[in-house]
């Protein structure tokens, strides 16, 4: 598994972003955040919900819906958002630290 890989959401609409460090690759779960199309997203909060383009669609990171799922559920990788490390880390800092 690679941090910041984006997978098709098998459980619903949009995508799933893997945000877990690769240093914990021995676990059988991954920490993930949903990526929803802007039209399907609740009101976006500055810093908490950065937006990205995935497969030509603008999506928002729904940081407030962070979860852990079995690693085996992450199949069908469609993208990697590693170039947006700062924005993703800032959103995670906002949910955990408030800044």
Describe the function of each predicted region.
Residues 1, 9, 89-93:
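Generic detection of intrinsically disordered/low-complexity segments and helix-coil linkers/edges
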Residues 2, 18, 74-78:
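Residues at structural and domain junctions
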Residues 56-99:
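C-terminal terminal-subdomain/extension
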Residues 3-6, 10-50:
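Compact nucleic-acid interaction/catalytic patches
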Residues 44, 49, 54-57, 64:
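A short, structured beta-strand/loop element
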């Amino acid at each position: 598994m690679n941090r910041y890989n984006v997978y098709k959401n098998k459980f619903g609409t949009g995508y799933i972003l893997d945000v877990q460090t690769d240093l914990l690759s021995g676990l059988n779960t991954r920490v993930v955040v949903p990526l929803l199309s802007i039209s399907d997203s609740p009101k976006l909060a500055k810093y908490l919900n950065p937006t990205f383009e995935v497969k030509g669609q603008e999506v928002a990171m729904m940081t407030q819906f962070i979860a852990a799922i079995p690693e085996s559920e992450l199949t069908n990788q469609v993208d990697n958002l590693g170039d947006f490390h700062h924005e993703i880390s800032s959103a995670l800092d906002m949910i955990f630290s408030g800044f």
